[in-house]
Amino acid sequence: MGVIQTLDRLMTNPMPEGRVEDILRPEGENPLLEKGYVTTSVDALLNWARTGSMWPMTFGLACCAVEMMHAGAARLDLDRYGVVFRPSPRQSDVMIVAGTLVNKMAPALRKVYDQMPDPKWVISMGSCANGGGYYHYSYSVVRGCDRIVPVDIYVPGCPPTAEALVYGILQLQKKIWRTQTIAR
């Protein structure tokens, strides 16, 4: 089985396996849906909206940014998952850090992260963003962007493929599904 077939199998539903929401049940199994009512929790509704409209702010620093652009192109088309790249941190809720982060760029990364509205998530893409990569022992390289901002998903590779980034985005969608927004 090829990579595309495996991704198609994984990309069908971001809902964790074994979890069924009222809104997703077939008509015969949900008596309220037959009467014209839809029931769900506020958490499920908010998380459904957040997973269906993730707007990443791209922070491309090196060659991994080329693979990030490839993921948004026609072959994989992130738009069908509700992922639309935004140029401004004030309009985005996901930051994709792709490439080598140097000490001089670290304050700018933190500033952009602080400008994003809550809730916000970070995807670290590539070996350089994850832990310094090939330039790990250089004096000017930050050994992982998780020293500057909290990272939710790590995408390994040098550079990671566009399919790996799509898989990381799907993992982030599953993580968002599991979060509880309203304190009980």
From Swiss-Prot:
NDH-1 shuttles electrons from NADH, via FMN and iron-sulfur (Fe-S) centers, to quinones in the respiratory chain. Couples the redox reaction to proton translocation (for every two electrons transferred, four hydrogen ions are translocated across the cytoplasmic membrane), and thus conserves the redox energy in a proton gradient. Belongs to the complex I 20 kDa subunit family. Gene3D superfamilies: 3.40.50.12280. InterPro entries: NADH_UbQ_OxRdtase-like_20kDa, NADH_UQ_OxRdtase_20Kd_su. Its EC number is 7.1.1.-. SUPFAM superfamilies: HydA/Nqo6-like. GO terms for molecular function: 4 iron, 4 sulfur cluster binding; iron ion binding; NADH dehydrogenase (ubiquinone) activity; NADH:ubiquinone reductase (non-electrogenic) activity; quinone binding. It catalyses: a quinone + NADH + 5 H(+)(in) = a quinol + NAD(+) + 4 H(+)(out). It is a peripheral membrane protein. PANTHER family: NADH DEHYDROGENASE (PTHR11995), NADH DEHYDROGENASE [UBIQUINONE] IRON-SULFUR PROTEIN 7, MITOCHONDRIAL (PTHR11995:SF14). [4Fe-4S] cluster binds at C63, C64, C128, C158. Keywords: 4Fe-4S, Cell inner membrane, Cell membrane, Iron, Iron-sulfur, Membrane, Metal-binding, NAD, Quinone, Translocase, Transport, Ubiquinone. NDH-1 is composed of 14 different subunits. Subunits NuoB, C, D, E, F, and G constitute the peripheral sector of the complex. This is NADH-quinone oxidoreductase subunit B. GO terms for cellular component: plasma membrane; respiratory chain complex I. Binds 1 [4Fe-4S] cluster. Its cofactor is [4Fe-4S] cluster. It holds the Pfam family Oxidored_q6. One of its GO terms (biological process) is aerobic respiration. It is an enzyme of class 7 (translocase).
